[in-house]
């Protein structure tokens, strides 16, 4: 929820040294990082060192479903014991076709990944210019820190009711008490004007709620 990334090269080196298994959750990275959208592990050159990797088709790819990769022994074990796999039906052929088309399209559009990072970085800079407390990180996640659950929900409601901006409040137990925040993830299609409108709305909401910035 902070938008941080792990030190994958160092972790993989330790795993290799001590014969440990590496498991990586790439649901927030697949499609968005790496030259072809393969994820953060690919971007930092560690993809072939990950033993088990899971991702989703429901975020960057905009469809439904998910996946787990690994060697044949691992995958056979998962198929045998994972209740989430055993007690569900297979994905619709229509969804599979849509997912395949989306993966192919995202793979060929690194320009959107570059633009995505530019817009996220730009939003962080704009927020800092008006003293809105944004958590520093080097990813596309933009956490605006509030620090109070009731206030976080109130501010989220105000953004929607008064400015037509939907933002999900992130409260305990998703994050620790005292670190509640509004969480934004701008896309490549969010224009500079849209980012400006968001920042201005947040500035007004923070002021109306008498939150110190």
Regions found by a protein language model. Name each.
Residues 55-56, 63-65, 89, 144, ...:
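Thr-Gly-centered strand-to-loop micro-motif
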Residues 2, 6, 114-123, 128-164, ...:
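Conserved PLP-binding catalytic core of the aspartate aminotransferase-like
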Residues 7-17, 43, 49, 122, ...:
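Alpha-helical structural signal in soluble globular domains
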Residues 161-162, 174-213:
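PLP-dependent enzyme catalytic core of the Aspartate aminotransferase-like
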Residues 1-19, 151-152, 193-194:
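Active-site core of PLP-dependent enzymes with the aminotransferase class I/II
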Residues 18-24, 28, 33-138, 151:
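Active-site C-terminal subdomain of aminotransferase-like
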């Amino acid at each position: 929820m902070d938008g941080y990334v792990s030190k994958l090269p160092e972790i993989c080196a330790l795993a290799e040294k001590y014969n440990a298994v590496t498991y990586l959750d790439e649901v927030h990275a697949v499609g968005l990082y790496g030259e072809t959208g393969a994820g953060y592990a690919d971007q930092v050159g560690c993809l072939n060192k990950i033993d088990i990797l899971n991702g989703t088709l429901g975020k960057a790819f905009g469809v439904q479903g998910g996946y787990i990769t690994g060697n044949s022994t691992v995958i056979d074990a998962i198929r045998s014991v994972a209740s989430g796999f055993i007690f569900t039906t297979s994905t619709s052929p229509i969804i599979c076709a849509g997912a395949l088309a989306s993966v192919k399209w995202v793979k060929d559009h690194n320009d959107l990944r570059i633009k995505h990072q530019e817009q996220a970085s730009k939003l962080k800079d704009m927020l800092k210019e008006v003293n809105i407390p944004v958590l520093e990180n080097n990813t596309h996640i933009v956490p605006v820190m509030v620090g109070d659950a009731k206030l976080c929900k109130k501010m989220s409601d105000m953004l929607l009711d008064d400015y037509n901006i939907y933002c999900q409040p992130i409260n305990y137990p998703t994050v620790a008490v005292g670190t509640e925040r509004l969480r934004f993830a701008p896309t490549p299609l969010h224009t500079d004007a849209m980012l400006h409108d968001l920042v201005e709305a947040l500035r007004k909401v923070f002021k109306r709620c008498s939150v110190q910035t």
